[in-house]
């Protein structure tokens, strides 16, 4: 990849991360809190242990994260239907504050996407799907390497 393309890509990733941090702050959340909430909204309820693994947090920080999200009204703890001895964390609806805060960026990105042909759109979202898998695999490798 030419260096200018690499720089454009790095700027894009930085802009996405900075927007995530700004969005979290606007909703009075930490960046990790917003990330955890996004995980729950995308994958559904999970145990605190699973959430800790996905966020890279240990038990204590995961408990405090869940406490903050629960206190803010974004999640609730509920008995695990498969094992009543366990607790799961589940998102509660769609957070209105988050939707309000993210609406301008979503609208702008939607406008940009409407400028692409169906073929370009397909390539773009194929890339997003493949890059998601690549980043998740790379993150897992880093976690495994650091744990060992």
Segments from the language model and where they lie:
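N-terminal leader segment of winged-helix/HTH proteins
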Residues: 1-27
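Short amphipathic alpha-helical/adjacent loop interface patches that line ligand
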Residues: 9, 16, 33, 106, ...
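Terminal interaction helix/tail motif
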Residues: 103-148
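Charged, amphipathic alpha-helical coiled-coil/dimerization segments
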Residues: 70-122
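Canonical helix-turn-helix DNA-binding module
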Residues: 45-89
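Residues at secondary-structure transition points
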Residues: 3, 27, 31, 35, ...
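N-terminal helix-turn-helix DNA-binding core of bacterial DNA-binding proteins
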Residues: 19-58
